[in-house]
């Protein structure tokens, strides 16, 4: 996958938040509106579809008792949000949010469907691998949880799905708040789960048995050399776009480990440094016609965790990134 074939990226800021807002995770809705979790303020926000004009104004939805982390849509307008007390009690929950009859301005009522037990430490990214199965990264327990959802939308159950050395964080290292396993995404065409491990600077994958939905083998190294946070994957092109958070870039890597062996780090955005991409945390493809693989939306924390060169954090943002072929 030579770097000269990588696309160019056009960045447009579509929404802004105050400084010191750690935009953590997102879910694109069918109309291209966005749900955004804010880790340090424990909040959930709504971003209107950026169609008629940009920027748009974010709409506050609710506050949780713990940090708001991963969010995933399991069926149209039904979302599951995980929350965790990351630093003290490690109390962690899964909430169900039904937006089928919701419209902006109405209140919402997330329902707790699961309280996690030991060895939970800090829930992070999440993804759907079957119609009723969610995988959730636990970035401080060095593992991935499997959550089975009941068909009737009631209480859920959880158990450890996979624990591996590649998922570990370093509580005694120079950045003890740096997560281990962080973002998780499922490639439906190949039945691989891909995940980032931020502390170890790894991008990994593990095959999933399509019948049992359990790991089918050991995790496999895909790429390394960057502090990847989360990512979105383009299965048609066979690539992933990784957000590097503290390193302020979006990097493109192949989903095939063999194609990364002689491939140096390639940043499609953020090199050279740009004020529009300070602290990118996650990304997701737009859901409009023809947007998959071409138009994605990314969150930034504005330097909340790692300030830009002058030491002053900027407003957190939602950025639209349009990928176009290099000439």
What are the residue ranges of the model-derived segments?
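Blade-level signature of beta-propeller repeat domains, shared across WD40, Kelch, NHL, RCC1
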Residues: 284-327
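Beta-rich, blade/repeat-based domains predominating
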Residues: 17-31, 63-88, 115-133, 165-192, ...
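Short loop/turn segments immediately following beta-strands, especially the blade-tip
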Residues: 47-52, 97-105, 147-155, 205-214, ...
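Short glycine/acidic-enriched loop and turn motifs that connect beta-strands
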Residues: 41-43, 85-89, 141-143, 200-202, ...
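A short beta-strand motif characteristic of beta-propeller blades
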Residues: 9-17, 53-62, 109-116, 158-175, ...
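Asp-box/WD-like beta-propeller blade repeats and closely related beta-sheet repeat scaffolds
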Residues: 8-10, 88-133, 137, 141-143, ...
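Loop/turn-rich, solvent-exposed surfaces of beta-rich toroidal or solenoidal domains
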Residues: 194, 200, 221-267
């Amino acid at each position: 996958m030579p770097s000269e074939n990588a696309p160019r990226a056009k960045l447009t800021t579509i929404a802004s938040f105050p400084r010191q807002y750690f935009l953590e995770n997102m879910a694109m809705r069918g109309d291209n509106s966005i749900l955004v979790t804010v880790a340090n303020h424990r909040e959930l926000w709504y971003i209107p579809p950026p169609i008629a004009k940009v920027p748009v104004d974010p709409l506050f939805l609710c506050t949780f008792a713990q940090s708001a982390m991963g969010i995933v849509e399991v069926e149209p307008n039904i979302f599951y949000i995980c929350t965790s007390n990351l630093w003290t009690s490690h109390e962690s929950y899964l909430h169900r949010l039904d937006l089928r009859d919701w419209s902006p301005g109405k209140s919402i009522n997330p329902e707790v469907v699961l309280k996690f037990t030991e060895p939970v430490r800090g829930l992070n990214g999440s993804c759907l691998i079957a119609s009723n199965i969610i995988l959730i990264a636990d970035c401080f327990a060095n593992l991935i949880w499997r959550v089975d959802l009941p068909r009737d939308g009631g209480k859920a159950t959880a158990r450890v799905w996979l624990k591996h050395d590649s998922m570990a964080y370093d509580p005694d290292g120079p950045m003890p708040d740096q997560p281990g396993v962080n973002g998780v995404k499922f490639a439906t065409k190949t039945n691989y789960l891909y995940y980032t491990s931020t502390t170890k600077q790894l991008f990994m994958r593990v095959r999933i048995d399509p019948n049992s939905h359990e790991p089918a083998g050991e995790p496999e190294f895909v790429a390394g050399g960057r502090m990847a946070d989360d990512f979105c994957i383009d299965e048609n092109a066979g690539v992933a776009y990784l957000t590097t958070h503290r390193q302020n870039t979006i990097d493109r890597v192949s989903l095939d480990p063999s194609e990364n062996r002689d491939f140096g780090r390639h940043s499609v955005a953020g090199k050279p440094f740009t004020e529009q991409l300070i602290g990118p945390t996650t990304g997701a493809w737009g859901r409009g016609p023809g947007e998959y693989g071409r138009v994605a939306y990314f969150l930034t924390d504005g330097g909340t965790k790692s300030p830009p060169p002058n030491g002053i954090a900027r407003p957190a943002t939602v950025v639209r990134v349009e990928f176009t072929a290099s000439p």
